A protein has these predicted regions:
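N-terminal Rossmann-like NAD(P)+-binding domain of SDR-like oxidoreductases, especially those catalyzing
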Residues: 1-116
Length: 116
């Protein structure tokens, strides 16, 4: 039986990192999406010692070209987790439109893409 493949949007955040660790222990292959793949942003994955076990893609503005690239490179994706979005309450108040785009519009784009 083949290992299941999970795509995690927001893999470098707290919940994404813990989910990736959990799924790796269940023998999943993980594809992770993060807005920022700098070393300082991937510290949770590094602390869990799973950074090298995840195929990580960086993308700041989710669009159909990026989604096509991910799904073309990874023909079979069994599960998709959307844990991405603005996590700073102060920033969400200061930048409500950007927060809405990050938290809602990006998810809608993913759902529209996978329904095709």
């Amino acid at each position: 039986m083949r290992n299941k493949i999970a795509l995690i949007f927001g893999v470098s955040g707290q919940d994404g990192a813990y989910l990736a660790d959990f799924l790796l222990k269940k023998k999943y292959k993980i594809i992770g999406i993060t807005r920022n793949n700098s070393k300082s942003n991937l510290f949770r994955l590094k602390k869990l010692k799973i950074e090298k076990k995840i195929k990580i893609y960086q993308n700041k503005s989710l669009n159909s070209d990026f989604l096509k690239k991910i799904f073309n490179k990874n023909k079979i994706i069994n599960e998709i987790y959307y844990l991405s979005g603005e996590t700073s309450p102060l920033r969400s108040i200061k930048e409500p439109i950007q927060t809405f785009e990050s938290n809602v519009i990006s998810l809608i784009k993913i759902l529209e893409f996978i329904k095709l």
